[in-house]
């Protein structure tokens, strides 16, 4: 998995439809490679010592230089060879938006055809700056309360497209790893299910945590999953980042409505996989369980008591108080949704039940909702391959039709 990637052949066409060979398509995008992959590329393809790869990696991820000619401590002969067989191709910024609260959102074009685009969000806070990164164009899991799900699914992002989001944001922010940090945390909580794009996500997270990359500690990189049990087990053996689970319901009946994946991996199996994750990764002492609160759906007191019991069971299984942390997320509405945000009174009452049960529970402050950058609102631009967009539009039209008739 860590070897240098072989870029698939890509061709363009003339106006008459005849294929034209693309020199760019044959070049290795160095953003695809982690440290080991870059070392192998320099040794096997360029015939260079591995330490030369370290020089170039720092130019790319510390100084945000994409032009080999600007890498002044790299010899001219090597720069010439790099120009011939490699490139640093970063995502193109379609537009960026600033929120009144300081949140920043980028729409980034993906792929050579530029038809698809994903969203990346930077959330500044006191003493920290968190980047929310996407892993797929769209999402195939169809969670009913998530805006991304209404867009359908196109494809997985490449490693370069994932780490390219970090590159674009870090460059914009003037981030200097190990010195002037504006980017202190990365959360794989953007568009898509990260564990359905396992290899590319793990490789990108390796660059995020590498001292030659962005130098983030393992605990400052968080992967959020809807609950692919076998892949959580695999992740435990290949990475030790922080784990978050999109739970959103305390029982299987309700969770199957909100997160259809629960039909395949019910809560008991999901919780067991989280226990195994912490058992393997001794440096991690907790799992964060995300719970989006929706009015009249999952925000009742009985739901809070059920959730508290589930979290206590997890703490007992791990024999660690606070092994389960709950992140309560007020629902962020989007066009066409049938859900509403819980009232502030109900949110605080829900949290109090958890706190009274000695469960660590915090309410996530809504950020960036004025630019549709809040949790659950990311949408991007997806050429749907699942026909879900059409189904969602029909649902909205049917609902509008009923309202008009009434």
Curated annotation (Swiss-Prot):
Record-linked InterPro entries: Aldolase_TIM, Methyltransferase_A, RlmN_N, RNA_MTrfase_RlmN, rRNA_lsu_MTrfase_RlmN/Cfr, rSAM
Q: Which GO terms describe its biological process?
A: rRNA base methylation; tRNA methylation
Residues involved in S-adenosyl-L-methionine binding:
192-193, 224, 246-248, 332
In the UniProt record, does the keyword Cell membrane occur? no
Enzyme Commission (EC) number = 2.1.1.192
Active-site residues (renumbered): 119 (proton acceptor), 375 (s-methylcysteine intermediate)
Domain Radical SAM core, chain residue ranges per copy: 125-370
User: Per its UniProt entry, which superkingdom is the organism in?
Assistant: Bacteria
Q: Which molecular function term from Gene Ontology is one that the record holds?
A: metal ion binding
Keywords from the named record: 4Fe-4S, Cytoplasm, Disulfide bond, Iron, Iron-sulfur, Metal-binding, Methyltransferase, rRNA processing, S-adenosyl-L-methionine, Transferase, tRNA processing
Q: Which SUPFAM superfamilies match?
A: Radical SAM enzymes (SSF102114)
Catalytic activity entry:
adenosine(2503) in 23S rRNA + 2 reduced [2Fe-2S]-[ferredoxin] + 2 S-adenosyl-L-methionine = 2-methyladenosine(2503) in 23S rRNA + 5'-deoxyadenosine + L-methionine + 2 oxidized [2Fe-2S]-[ferredoxin] + S-adenosyl-L-homocysteine; adenosine(37) in tRNA + 2 reduced [2Fe-2S]-[ferredoxin] + 2 S-adenosyl-L-methionine = 2-methyladenosine(37) in tRNA + 5'-deoxyadenosine + L-methionine + 2 oxidized [2Fe-2S]-[ferredoxin] + S-adenosyl-L-homocysteine
Q: What is its main location?
A: cytoplasm
Which cofactor is recorded for it? [4Fe-4S] cluster
Compartments reported by the entry: Cytoplasm
Q: Identify the residues that bind [4Fe-4S] cluster.
A: 139, 143, 146
Q: Name one GO cellular component term.
A: cytoplasm
Q: Give the cofactor binding note.
A: Binds 1 [4Fe-4S] cluster. The cluster is coordinated with 3 cysteines and an exchangeable S-adenosyl-L-methionine.
UniProt xrefs under Gene3D superfamilies: 1.10.150.530, Aldolase class I (3.20.20.70)
More details: Reaction proceeds by a ping-pong mechanism involving intermediate methylation of a conserved cysteine residue.
Chain's role: Specifically methylates position 2 of adenine 2503 in 23S rRNA and position 2 of adenine 37 in tRNAs. m2A2503 modification seems to play a crucial role in the proofreading step occurring at the peptidyl transferase center and thus would serve to optimize ribosomal fidelity.
Q: Which family does it belong to?
A: Belongs to the radical SAM superfamily. RlmN family.
The record, for NCBIfam families, names: rRNA_mod_RlmN
Q: What name does UniProt use for this protein?
A: Dual-specificity RNA methyltransferase RlmN
Upper classification of the organism: Bacteria, Pseudomonadati, Pseudomonadota, Gammaproteobacteria, Lysobacterales
């Amino acid at each position: 998995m860590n070897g240098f990637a072989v870029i698939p052949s890509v061709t363009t066409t003339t106006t008459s439809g005849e294929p034209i060979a693309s020199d760019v398509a044959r070049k290795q995008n160095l953003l695809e490679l982690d440290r080991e992959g870059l070392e192998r590329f320099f040794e096997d393809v360029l015939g260079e010592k591995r330490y030369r790869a370290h020089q170039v990696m720092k130019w790319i991820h510390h100084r945000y230089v994409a032009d080999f000619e600007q890498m002044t401590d790299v010899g001219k002969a090597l720069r010439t060879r790099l120009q011939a067989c490699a490139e640093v191709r970063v995502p193109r910024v379609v537009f960026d938006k600033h929120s009144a609260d300081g949140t920043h959102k980028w729409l980034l074009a993906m792929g050579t055809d530029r038809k698809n685009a994903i969203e990346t969000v930077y959330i500044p806070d006191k003493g920290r700056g968190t980047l929310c990164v996407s892993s797929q164009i769209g999402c195939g899991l169809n969670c009913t309360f998530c805006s991304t799900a209404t867009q359908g699914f196109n494809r997985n992002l490449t490693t370069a497209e994932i780490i390219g989001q970090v590159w674009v944001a870090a460059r914009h922010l003037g981030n200097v790893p190990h010195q002037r940090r504006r980017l202190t945390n990365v959360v794989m909580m953007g568009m898509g299910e990260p564990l359905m794009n396992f290899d590319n996500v793990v490789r990108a997270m390796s660059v995020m945590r590498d001292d030659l990359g962005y130098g983030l500690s393992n605990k400052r990189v968080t992967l959020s999953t809807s609950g692919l049990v076998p892949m959580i087990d695999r992740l435990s053996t290949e990475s030790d980042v922080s784990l978050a689970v999109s739970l959103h319901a305390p029982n299987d009946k309700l969770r199957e409505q909100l997160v259809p994946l629960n039909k395949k991996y019910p809560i008991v199996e999901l919780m067991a996989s989280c226990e195994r994750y912490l058992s393997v990764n001794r440096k991690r002492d907790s799992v964060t369980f995300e719970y989006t609160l929706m009015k009249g759906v999952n925000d009742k007191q009985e739901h809070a008591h059920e959730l508290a019991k589930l979290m206590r069971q997890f703490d007992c299984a791990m024999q660690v108080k606070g092994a389960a942390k709950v992140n309560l997320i007020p629902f962020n509405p989007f066009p066409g949704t049938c859900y509403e945000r819980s009232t502030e009174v109900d949110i605080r009452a829900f949290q109090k039940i958890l706190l009274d049960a000695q469960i660590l529970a915090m309410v996530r402050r809504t950020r960036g909702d004025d630019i549709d950058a809040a949790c659950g609102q990311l949408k991007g631009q997806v050429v749907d391959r699942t026909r879900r967009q059409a189904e969602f539009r029909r649902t909205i039209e049917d609902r509008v039709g009923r309202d008009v008739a009434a």
